[in-house]
A protein has these predicted regions:
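Peripheral interaction segments used for macromolecular assembly
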Residues: 1-162
Length: 162
């Protein structure tokens, strides 16, 4: 099952071993080479709280309200300008999504990910259109390049009945 990566922002980070609420997810980080989620950043709950990140391999489970990690030992404190690995979803949002033959499909609004292996399964474009993708077929740089036949695979949002 695929979930919007942006839906993870704002949920609690909880350590199972210590039974502690560590903070709330502030960002999802994606490796542009592998096209997989690699980490989650969070801030402590105090005003002006410190920034930390958790590598995805240390995440036990993601629920509707909680990102569960085994222990606080997995947490990396971001100090002196240190950043989590990969690129943040926020940095990727708004990028132009273009086919290899130059057709502009829209701007990246979100990414659908699989919790099973943390891979990108679909790109969500402006207008809530979805483009199912294979990670090997997309390129992420200053923009997102997708195969030439991608325009024909765009899924329009379902009409809402009133």
């Amino acid at each position: 099952m695929l979930e919007h990566a942006s839906d993870i922002r704002g949920i609690l980070v909880v350590s199972a071993k210590e039974g502690a609420q560590l903070g709330t997810v502030s960002e999802v980080h994606i490796d542009p080479q592998t096209k997989h989620v690699v980490a989650f950043s969070y801030r402590t709950r105090r005003i002006g709280g410190d920034r930390y990140y958790v590598p995805v391999e240390d995440v036990d489970r993601v629920g509707r309200d909680v990102l569960l990690i085994a222990s606080e030992e997995a947490v990396v404190h971001q100090t002196n300008g240190e950043h989590a690995p990969g690129r943040s979803l926020e940095d990727l949002q708004g990028m132009r999504v273009t086919t290899m033959d130059g057709k502009h499909l829209g701007e990246l609004a979100d990414i659908d990910i699989s919790y099973a292996d943390w891979s990108i399964g679909a790109l969500v474009l402006s207008g809530a259109r979805r483009l199912p993708v294979e990670v090997a077929d997309i390129r992420v740089g200053d923009g997102v390049l997708v195969p030439a036949d991608s325009a024909g695979r765009l899924v329009e949002p379902a009409e809402k009945s009133g």
